[in-house]
Amino acid sequence: MATTGNWQSTSCILCSVNCGLQVQVEDGHFKKIKGDKTNPGSKGYTCEKPASLDRYQNHADRITSPLRRREDGSFESIDWDTAIREISGKLAHIRDTHGGSKILYYGGGGQGNHLGGAYSAATRRALEMRYSSNALAQEKTGEFWVERQMFQARPEPDFEHAEVSVFVGKNPWQSHGFERARVVLKAIAKDPNRGMIVMDPRRTETADLADVFLQVKPGTDAFVLAA
């Protein structure tokens, strides 16, 4: 990629909030990364994760080709055609011997582009798979179910204006929060007319800002909520 000093607008893909970013690219590397103040959602805010994007993309230890395990447990690099041929052959053998229902497809798109999940359709069809799953099955299905029971829809939480905010097993100060999470959390903590309740086995950065912190034992959160 040619050297450029111009700021380019884009968005972060490291969580579902997708904060707006501005980046400078030089010779295929991110030279500078900052929050995009013109983004109507994040308004220039970012957490620390985007600052590491160049390290993720260009780290010396990044795996750039398939690795095949040797008998001694070490790995050797192989080309993509070989990897696809060997893996597809083994999967086809499982299908022919035990049936496609014995193969579980797990995967999908990234946080910034979920179209990758659709690419699995041809593979699942060819292998006669019946079952599939992804990270949302663990992370979000319970949340979606509760929202449907309470609101008959999936509302977007308005923590910026809420009088009372409740976080159960969630630390938006660090990850997977909401737009301008740290700015909003600090504003809630400083406002005597607003409250924050955190329920978590671990005392997190968000818990340190809370008016009420319930440090429950793992597995007991449902009982606390029921009470």
Give short role names for the model-derived ranges:
Residues 1-227:
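N-terminal export/assembly segments and adjacent metallocofactor-ligating motifs
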